Amino acid sequence: MSILKNAPQPELIPTYDGSNQSTHPSVLQFDTPWNGYRFWMAMTPYPFNYDGLEDPSVLASNDTKTWVVPDGLTNPLTPAPKPGHNCDVELVYNRDCNELWLYYVEADDIVQSWVKLMRSKDGVHWTKPEIVLHDPVQKYSILSPCVQRMQDGTWRMWYVDTGNTGYQNQSNKVRTRTSEDGLHWSAEETCEDLSQPGYQIWHLTVWHDP
């Protein structure tokens, strides 16, 4: 049973490719405007299921209805790798340094994958991608990373391990890691079985409610 009804019509989310077909939004809300906006979103285009344009993009809003590219920013933040594709953005506010941190997945679609991080002090100027996780032997083992800052200041990441077969994998697992700084992560642990008969674990989100 659905808790919330679907919206009568989708919101218009502009994408750099002009399709306005976006996926995997990650939205932050601020009590007062942060660099001019109360809401910041990371997302990727995904026109007609084409992952070649699934590159990290950032938008901002003050009402969640009208989303704009902030002045001075050009999407995407980083282009698609060759070979492979980007996907699965996660936007986090780091209160220690007053920065937006954007995690995303890069897969070469051959044998390996990475979680990379870009940082910004104003939402417009972003650092070059840096590697925070790397799997050299499985191309889809770190999908849909979700990062939360815990009350004690530590970080925690959850993601879906689909091995080398992606969404067709029938034994997907949810993994988790911890970190002291959001950059260096512990060895992974497997969460307790979250499988449901007839369903596959795919994209997820986690929200910490203290």
Specify the residue positions occupied by each region the protein language model found:
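Beta-rich carbohydrate-recognition and catalytic domains
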Residues: M1-G84, V92-L143, Q148-W202, W207-P210
